[in-house]
Amino acid sequence: MSEKIIRGVKFGVLSPNEIRQMSVTAIITSEVYDEDGTPIEGGVMDPKLGVIEPGQKCPVCGNTLAGCPGHFGHIELIKPVIHIGYVKHIYDFLRSTCWRCGRIKIKEQDLERYKRIYNAIKLRWPSAARRLVEYIKKISIKNLECPHCGEKQFKIKLEKPYNFNEERNGSIVKLSPSEIRDRLERIPDSDVELLGYDPKSSRPEWMILTVLPVPPITIRPSITIESGIRAEDDLTHKLVDIIRLNERLKESIEAGAPQLIIEDLWDLLQYHVATYFDNEIPGLPPAKHRSGRPLRTLAQRLKGKEGRFRGNLSGKRVDFSARTVISPDPNLSIDEVGIPYTIARMLTVPERVTNINIERIRQYIINGPDKWPGANYVIKPDGRRIDLRYVKDRKELASSITAGYVVERHLVDGDVVLFNRQPSLHRISMMAHKVRVLPGRTFRLNLLDCPPYNADFDGDEMNLHVPQSEEAIAEARELMLVHKNIITPRYGGPIIGGGQDYISGAYLLSVKTTLLTVEEVATILGVTDFVGELGEPAILAPKPYYTGKQVISLFLPKDFNFHGPANISKGPRACKDEICPHDSFIVIKNGLLLEGVFDKKAIGNQQPESMLHWSIREYGTEYGKWLMDNVFKMFIRFLEMRGFTMTLEDITIPDEAQNEITTKIKEGYSQVDEYIRKFNEGQLEPIPGRTIEESLESYILDTLDKLRKVAGEIATKYLDPFNNVYIMAITGARGSELNITQMTALLGQQSVRGERIRRGYRERTLSLFKYGDIAPEARGFVKNSFMRGLSPYEMFFHAAGGREGLVDTAVKTSQSGYMQRRLINALSDLRIEYDGTVRSLYGDIVQVVYGDDAVHPMYSAHSKSVNVNRVIERVIGWKR
């Protein structure tokens, strides 16, 4: 068979003759099976249409199930019907051409000129040719008299979905499909071309169906239900309805039935043919099963997420994959994933037998499919597969294998697999991990790996895929391993890093009050692979003590320099340089942590230009992996030793603090009352550009916002600096000072759409308030804290504010998902060429220099090509 190169794909409309030629049989009866359950010849399951049962031979091509592609049949329609997919095209043809002579309603000399222009531009500038066609249609539709035959033209209206009405001498006449077909037949080929169609492959009258193609059985196979009853495909049901109606229409015409009955049956045939193509036509009731379920017809098989394109071509279900719940395991390396034994025994990797690995593989074969590490299949050099479940003497088989065999063995420690969590919103939602087979029934994941996957452990499930070829495994190992993706391609900062307990532990270990004995240091270092001298303790007498900073310094490169504020550098503890009494400015000189604490700004995930970021960027991702596998584990160990809990005592403030807050609330309420009094007396000064009512709302909101801030400051002033809740908030481990304010002092103003709550009953939010009351409490201000508890109406307002967040989340998720899909489809053919330009599939330049600087964000210094300050700091240990 000679090879051919595909130059292009051309779409057209099937002519009635083409439908008959590609058909192997006419479908003439609505009966499907006879009494024995054998398909009837001339029915919709005629054996000539293809084979769906194994062992049968196709009477047309002689092939079995594996080789028979299926064959088309056809139904000769008694009356023509409109193809629902071409209604708009038919409408354009009818309005642009004369009903009598079929010519475009434009003068002959103008038509000749348009033809010359169209022929000159149609190949070189197809978009310009399309605009010319639209222009021809536009001016032709406007003409009320045919310039060729002089006939008066009537206005045609489309009554959706497929009825065409014509206004003739004041009355409205419905055009039948036969009449429409006659008109379309009269349009000459030259005019069809000027209206944008190729008359060789798309004559307009072919859009009115006289012959309906019947698809092969292979695309609409029947299934046998457990009870032994055959269930037919939705398309088969629809085709039976069409044939049944076609027969009734034929009988009615032959019996000389009244025109009204014939037209009703014709309309019904039109409905069935339309819903056969698309069962979701606006304005048309969908065809349904007896159960009430709408039929899934041709368009539904192609459209949407579950359709043929997105469901079976762009995305497929795959083998060698697993899915289960994820659990945290801080003892795994960031590059590893814990896999249950059950899954490790089911998923296999093909390993080729060589003289080096033959003994190990023989042991896998002896272990078999049920004992880990074993094997499930042996593939001989001739391609035959041996299933080890059915081999009685596995030892004999193991001894017979030689180099060249392939064994599908179980997953073992160190195998490379792909790990993914949906929704996969960016590239690093799928990364490669190394297998660690563990007991249990869940996947185990290091907590540091959560941010790129956006994973947590409240029931999330993740997918695992096992690459099968050496090339795929090599690509995954070189490009996709977790430590090679610590720096995100989004902005060039570390997406993997500390969070929650890691940050609390790092802060408590690095804070200047932390002193450790040699034994405690040894306990902490026991979870790391540190080997080396501890150095001299910071305190020698009365007892040797190391500081937490000394322990952390053991893991920093000896030439590493860094300066920068910590997360706790806020308010009264803020520091701008190294002269800092609050320990809130980090100074690392020649690998020694001299000052400052490690918190979110130093080691947190998604923190660009942090200590973690520069150390990974300058010493490589292997160092970053080592740091996370050791130092971060050490932070957790220290937290375990010290203990870290949260109790009600942590959010209880003394009475004097509560009295201060109550006084401030009263002052705030008085201020609001004063604004309301001024408003009622007409003395309130409006804010420029706002109405007096808007100004009042703005003044009240500002006052209540200040009140919440003051209450929060009072509450935190009375909290112990080593209060665990306070530590979590100031270090950036979890929560914020606002959360502390809400737990200890007051919740503050609840808002809906950025305003105070105003909807409810007429002129008041709830029935317990007076009409027209706009005081803080009547409009959603909550003066209680979570600790003290909310009153019933405060609880109601709080729920109203919370609901807005839930609705927002649901709406934005679907909107952003759809926007991303459109963006991906629009940008999918862009790529960076070797000359640095960004080009489309056709070579069009979209960007002369990628990103205007030709720098990959992943390898940039936080989106800059070079950070000069950092270069100076790195070399001389000081910033400019």
Curated annotation (Swiss-Prot):
Superkingdom per UniProt: Archaea
State a single Gene Ontology molecular function.
Answer: zinc ion binding
- Output the InterPro entries linked to this UniProt entry: DNA-dir_RpoC_beta_prime (IPR045867), RNA_pol_asu (IPR000722), RNA_pol_N (IPR006592), RNA_pol_Rpb1_1 (IPR007080), RNA_pol_Rpb1_3 (IPR007066), RNA_pol_Rpb1_4 (IPR007083), RNA_pol_Rpb1_5 (IPR007081), RNA_pol_Rpb1_clamp_domain (IPR044893)
Supply the enzyme class, top level.
transferase
EC number(s): the record gives 2.7.7.6
Activity regulation summary: (Microbial infection) Binds to viral protein RIP (AC Q3V4R7), which inhibits global transcription.
Q: Where's it found, cell-wise?
A: Cytoplasm
Locate the residues binding Zn(2+) 2: 98, 101, 146, 149
* Residues engaged in binding Zn(2+) 1: 58, 61, 68, 71
Residues that bind Mg(2+) = 456, 458, 460
- Where do the annotations place Zn(2+) 3 binding? 573, 575, 580, 582, 584
Which GO terms are recorded in the biological process aspect for this UniProt protein?
DNA-templated transcription
Cofactor dependence is on:
Mg(2+); Zn(2+)
Q: How is the cofactor bound?
A: Binds 3 Zn(2+) per subunit.
Q: Pfam families annotated for this entry?
A: RNA_pol_Rpb1_1, RNA_pol_Rpb1_2, RNA_pol_Rpb1_3, RNA_pol_Rpb1_4, RNA_pol_Rpb1_5
Which UniProt keywords are present, listed alphabetically? Cytoplasm, DNA-binding, DNA-directed RNA polymerase, Magnesium, Metal-binding, Nucleotidyltransferase, Transcription, Transferase, Zinc
The role this protein plays is:
DNA-dependent RNA polymerase (RNAP) catalyzes the transcription of DNA into RNA using the four ribonucleoside triphosphates as substrates. Forms the clamp head domain.
Q: What else is known?
A: Corresponds to about the first two-thirds of the bacterial beta' subunit.
The subunit field of the Swiss-Prot or TrEMBL record says:
Part of the 13-subunit RNA polymerase complex. Interacts with TFS4. (Microbial infection) Binds viral protein RIP, which blocks global transcription.
Family to which the UniProt record says this protein belongs:
Belongs to the RNA polymerase beta' chain family.
Q: What is this protein called?
A: DNA-directed RNA polymerase subunit Rpo1N
| Species in which this protein is naturally found | Sulfolobus acidocaldarius (strain ATCC 33909 / DSM 639 / JCM 8929 / NBRC 15157 / NCIMB 11770)
Identify the gene encoding this protein: rpo1N
